[in-house]
Amino acid sequence: MTDSDGKTDKSGEPAAEVEPVVSKPYVMPDDPEDDALDALNKQLAEAKDRTLRTLAEMENLRKRTAREVSDARTYGISGFARDVLEIADNLQRALDAVPADARAAPDPGLKALIEGVELTERSLHNALEKHGVKKFDPAGEKFDPNVHQAMYEVPDPSIPVGTVAQVIQAGYMIGERVLRPALVGVAKGGAKAAAPE
């Protein structure tokens, strides 16, 4: 059972013609308004700026943290070293308290004691230097308030003004920092010190 077109349905009756489905044409929405595009560009620029600032801040934080860790390694023992300096000073005072004629005496017990104190002092200074603590003796140097502490003035015309004439107590540095300033007497007489070149 076919019709003249050759189309039949199961019941043998001619099939109804089916109209082909045609999709509706796609209509483009109106172009975004210029204001909306400007707003998106502004948001993009702000996001880029925030990202760059965050990256820069993170890099600065990394550098600052590395510097703080380095400083902690170098200067972390400052408090302990300051306390140990008192021991070094006491050892030096003990050696200074022994009169020269007693050092020359043939007493083996006294000589052994003096040698023991000297050895202990050297060992202590070596241990301090191993950890970055260095002793400095500024005798004859130009007075520098950053590393010297003036205790008094020395009226000596043979020494240029502003020169360290006497050292009462040696100073100590840890790395590039002053751990303890040197206690000094500064010359107030004589010619002015020559300017360093």
From Swiss-Prot:
<dbReference type="InterPro" id="IPR013805">
    <property type="entry name" value="GrpE_coiled_coil"/>
</dbReference>
<keyword id="KW-0963">Cytoplasm</keyword>
<feature type="region of interest" description="Disordered">
    <location>
        <begin position="1"/>
        <end position="35"/>
    </location>
</feature>
<comment type="subunit">
    <text>Homodimer.</text>
</comment>
<dbReference type="GO" id="GO:0051087">
    <property type="term" value="F:protein-folding chaperone binding"/>
</dbReference>
<protein>
    <recommendedName>
        <fullName>Protein GrpE</fullName>
    </recommendedName>
</protein>
<dbReference type="GO" id="GO:0006457">
    <property type="term" value="P:protein folding"/>
</dbReference>
<dbReference type="GO" id="GO:0051082">
    <property type="term" value="F:unfolded protein binding"/>
</dbReference>
<dbReference type="GO" id="GO:0005737">
    <property type="term" value="C:cytoplasm"/>
</dbReference>
<dbReference type="Pfam" id="PF01025">
    <property type="entry name" value="GrpE"/>
</dbReference>
<dbReference type="GO" id="GO:0000774">
    <property type="term" value="F:adenyl-nucleotide exchange factor activity"/>
</dbReference>
<comment type="similarity">
    <text>Belongs to the GrpE family.</text>
</comment>
<dbReference type="InterPro" id="IPR009012">
    <property type="entry name" value="GrpE_head"/>
</dbReference>
<dbReference type="GO" id="GO:0042803">
    <property type="term" value="F:protein homodimerization activity"/>
</dbReference>
<feature type="compositionally biased region" description="Basic and acidic residues">
    <location>
        <begin position="1"/>
        <end position="12"/>
    </location>
</feature>
<keyword id="KW-0143">Chaperone</keyword>
<comment type="function">
    <text>Participates actively in the response to hyperosmotic and heat shock by preventing the aggregation of stress-denatured proteins, in association with DnaK and GrpE. It is the nucleotide exchange factor for DnaK and may function as a thermosensor. Unfolded proteins bind initially to DnaJ; upon interaction with the DnaJ-bound protein, DnaK hydrolyzes its bound ATP, resulting in the formation of a stable complex. GrpE releases ADP from DnaK; ATP binding to DnaK triggers the release of the substrate protein, thus completing the reaction cycle.</text>
</comment>
<dbReference type="InterPro" id="IPR000740">
    <property type="entry name" value="GrpE"/>
</dbReference>
<keyword id="KW-0346">Stress response</keyword>
